């Protein structure tokens, strides 16, 4: 059953899956790479269908999405964890 929110935020399930994954993995982004990729692909499809000027809460703006997709192609996939125990 889809709600009106799902129609305005078609990538909401993917965005929520990222939050769940991050919480389960102590916010280690590298453990959630595939799920993040799924969100970016959903957002890419959203913009292809609706135009780059449209917005949805769950997707980065079109220009930022383009940058993120390019970074992932270049292998710069995940944020790096900072070890706060090191001086």
From Swiss-Prot:
Cellular component aspect of the GO annotation: mitochondrial intermembrane space
SUPFAM superfamilies tied to this protein: Cysteine alpha-hairpin motif
Keyword Disulfide bond found: yes
Keywords: Disulfide bond, Mitochondrion, Repeat
Coiled-coil ranges from the UniProt annotation: none
A matching Pfam family: CMC4
Gene3D superfamilies with a match to the protein in the record: CytochromE C oxidase copper chaperone
Motif (Cx9C motif 2): 32-42
Disulfide cross-links: 11-42, 21-32
Domain CHCH: start-end pairs: 8-50
Cell location: Mitochondrion intermembrane space
Residue interval(s) of motif Cx9C motif 1: 11-21
Record-stated family: Belongs to the CMC4 family.
Domain statement: The twin Cx9C motifs are involved in the recognition by the mitochondrial disulfide relay system.
Name this polypeptide is given: Cx9C motif-containing protein 4, mitochondrial
Organism (species): Debaryomyces hansenii (strain ATCC 36239 / CBS 767 / BCRC 21394 / JCM 1990 / NBRC 0083 / IGC 2968) (Yeast)
Species classification: Eukaryota, Fungi, Dikarya, Ascomycota, Saccharomycotina
């Amino acid at each position: 059953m889809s709600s009106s929110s799902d129609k305005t935020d078609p990538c909401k399930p993917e965005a929520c899956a990222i939050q769940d994954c991050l919480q389960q993995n102590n916010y280690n982004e590298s453990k959630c790479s595939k799920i993040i990729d799924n969100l970016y692909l959903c957002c890419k499809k959203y913009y292809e269908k609706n135009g780059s000027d449209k917005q949805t809460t769950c997707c980065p703006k079109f220009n930022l999405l383009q940058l993120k997709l390019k970074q992932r192609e270049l292998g710069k996939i995940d944020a790096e964890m900072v070890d706060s125990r090191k001086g």
